[in-house]
């Protein structure tokens, strides 16, 4: 017996706020728009094959992968070289200051960053984080612990 899925719009409505908060925490407000759209486009394509046991963890896993894609793409961007480089003022930071917490989270090693974001910004259990990252539950727990420990050290230094 197969369990029928609710309509995709209902799925989107149920999870949009969680995905949005997770992506803003992961990639920042500006990039979150694009990642959000890509997340739900991918989710819509894969929706008929989704296992209904934990749809929230499933869509946050997709969001996590889109955030990783965003960071990979930023690393590949061409850098202009030459004497004719334009002088551009840094845009104002539209997000409120947070004492550098999110900058420090973004500076964590990728496995720790993913575990911390999924666990705390995504509010997933360690088991769900493990599934999202494709690691054991113990590895997910360890990565979150090590990431938090590193953040505490940096915040108190």
Which residues fall in each region the model found?
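A short, charge-rich alpha-helical start-of-domain segment used by transcription regulators
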Residues: 1-21, 113
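C-terminal flanking helix
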Residues: 20, 40, 109, 113, ...
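Arg/Lys-rich amphipathic alpha helix in sigma70-family domain 2
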Residues: 61-82, 94
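DNA-recognition helix of helix-turn-helix
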Residues: 64, 68, 133-157
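Sigma70-family region 2
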Residues: 2, 29, 38-55, 73-75, ...
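A short pre-motif secondary-structure segment
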Residues: 115-119
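Acidic, proline/glycine-rich intrinsically disordered inter-domain spacer in sigma factors
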Residues: 2, 6, 74, 83-106
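Short, small-hydrophobic-rich alpha-helical interface motif
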Residues: 19, 23, 32-43, 62, ...
């Amino acid at each position: 017996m197969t369990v029928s899925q609710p309509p995709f719009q209902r799925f989107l409505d149920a999870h949009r706020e969680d995905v949005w908060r997770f992506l803003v925490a992961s990639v920042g407000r500006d990039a979150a728009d694009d990642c959000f759209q890509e997340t739900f486009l991918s989710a819509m394509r894969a929706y008929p094959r989704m296992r209904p046991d934990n749809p929230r963890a499933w869509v946050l896993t997709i969001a996590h992968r889109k955030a990783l894609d965003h960071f990979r793409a930023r690393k590949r961007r061409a850098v202009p070289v030459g004497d004719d480089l334009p002088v551009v003022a840094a845009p104002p930071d539209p997000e409120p200051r947070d004492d550098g917490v999110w900058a420090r989270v973004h500076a964590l090693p990728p496995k720790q960053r993913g575990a911390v974001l999924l666990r705390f910004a995504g509010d997933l259990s360690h088991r769900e984080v493990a599934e999202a990252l494709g690691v054991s539950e113990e590895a997910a727990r360890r990565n979150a612990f090590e990431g938090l420990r590193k953040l505490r050290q940096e915040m108190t230094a």
